[in-house]
Amino acid sequence: MAAPALALVSFEDVVVTFTGEEWGHLDLAQRTLYQEVMLETCRLLVSLGHPVPKPELIYLLEHGQELWTVKRGLSQSTCAGEKAKPKITEPTASQLAFSEESSFQELLAQRSSRDSRLGQARDEEKLIKIQEGNLRPGTNPHKEICPEKLSYKHDDLEPDDSLGLRVLQERVTPQDALHECDSQGPGKDPMTDARNNPYTCTECGKGFSKKWALVRHQQIHAGVKPYECNECGKACRYMADVIRHMRLHTGEKPYKCIECGKAFKRRFHLTEHQRIHTGDKPYECKECGKAFTHRSSFIQHNMTHTREKPFLCKECGKAFYYSSSFAQHMRIHTGKKLYECGECGKAFTHRSTFIQHNVTHTGEKPFLCKECGKTFCLNSSFTQHMRIHTGEKPYECGECGKAFTHRSTFIRHKRTHTGEKPFECKECGKAFCDSSSLIQHMRIHTGEKPYECSECGKAFTHHSVFIRHNRTHSGQKPLECKECAKAFYYSSSFTRHMRIHTGEKPYVCRECGKAFTQPANFVRHNRIHTGEKPFECKECEKAFCDNFALTQHMRTHTGEKPFECNECGKTFSHSSSFTHHRKIHTRV
């Protein structure tokens, strides 16, 4: 059968208007919602090719001004692209008549979500068939759109309805709408609720004052998503969701920050962004008083007090505070790598790793530190780097009071108190505190050495060792001690050296109270108390507390004497013996 002809659509049909008295009944939230819905509708029509007129009503909408003095003077336009002739009349104190078939009732009922959602009203005496893709003008403002990009679908149509849809419609007056709005307020007793909301959902018990509202609510339980995007086939429950979704395809970002010019697809995101400029933090934790800009951050923070980790991995039993962390973790089990490089085809599990990899092709590092000139590809890396200059350490250990610049370092540190080592090697059973250590360890089994020196061709298992090696070619020692001017290749060496000047000994033995400057010395000392000797000689099975002692012992089997005296040519197996020998030559 041939497709039905497109019906004429009047722009007047998509405008909801009020008298001055009706406008006065609306609170600020309802007026704001009205403005957003109308502007959303206008933008949708424009994006679909409608030559929508922009009279004074629309001008006032865009500028957030009062609307009750505006009189509608709008002419018709068509989906087929006929030219519209805007007609603007002088503002008067009397406002336009409110259309009984408008969606005012829906706007008020849905004001809390601040979304323009399409209501499907039902009149028991009225069942209207509408041609597919063409909705009757005047039934609902959001339905009057061209069906080129959006379509309405329903799975349970009778055979004779294959070309039509059933639209449930009810006439709603402003008084009905305001009554429903008031009846949903706080302080109502159960009897009043039952009288005002006679239509009850059998699934969840929620009450509604109108039958059409109950029907629409029951779509949630039924899983009905009648609005489908013709670009990708995604289905949505509400028209407003389709409108927002379409911006993914069009790239439209209609909400622009007047402070910095950044644009957003949703007004909600703009509102949150503007708090960066205003410093507003409306979400405050009752436990500790910490305030947050975003509600999502506030909810995540609250979980640190409740210790709730609602996202549980069924594969390994690990639980997570955040759905994003859970989703990333699940990729470990599934092996899924969502982010693929268009240049070399390499795939990545995490978006941040993918972005960092892309820099190897583009060389782009847009985040510049004004203090030292260092650049970064990720804003998060830049933020962490800035803490070096500011000295900020936002992550403090509740056990020992030690503070950390990076969250990852803080998490690893906490495991020194708990003894937790959640990352286990499947080859040898060795466990690690963090995933990066496990990845590096796995290279022992695989023999992988991904870091190759372009100067000499030497390859390395660890990135840190590779960086240190590169400095042997450049001679660069970027870390200089301000006390004695000694320079170091590595930050770890620099940190250990600084303890000579400060006298800091952060590693304290719980058994005997002895303190150490270096973590390696602390670990070796602890083995005196535990009796642990993990390093065993394969030749004679003798065991040692540390790897250094094993290395020296192995020279008794190999005969290696790496320490040679420049004065007399004598060689030694141990550095201590070599140092003692040199004193013979230096004696006066």
UniProtKB/Swiss-Prot annotation:
Any one GO molecular function term: zinc ion binding
GO cellular component: nucleus
PROSITE patterns: KRAB (PS50805), ZINC_FINGER_C2H2_1 (PS00028), ZINC_FINGER_C2H2_2 (PS50157)
Keyword Zinc-finger listed: yes
Primary localization class, coarse: nucleus
Subcellular localization: Nucleus
Keyword Transcription regulation among record annotations: yes
GO biological process, one term: regulation of transcription by RNA polymerase II
Zinc finger boundaries on the chain: C2H2-type: 199-221, 227-249, 255-277, 283-305, 311-333, 339-361, 367-389, 395-417, 423-445, 451-473, 479-501, 507-529, 535-557, 563-585
Alphabetical keyword list: DNA-binding, Metal-binding, Nucleus, Repeat, Transcription, Transcription regulation, Zinc, Zinc-finger
Domain KRAB: 9-80
Physiological role: May be involved in transcriptional regulation.
Family per similarity comment: Belongs to the krueppel C2H2-type zinc-finger protein family.
Protein name: Zinc finger protein 599
Source organism (scientific name): Homo sapiens (Human)
Gene name per UniProt: ZNF599
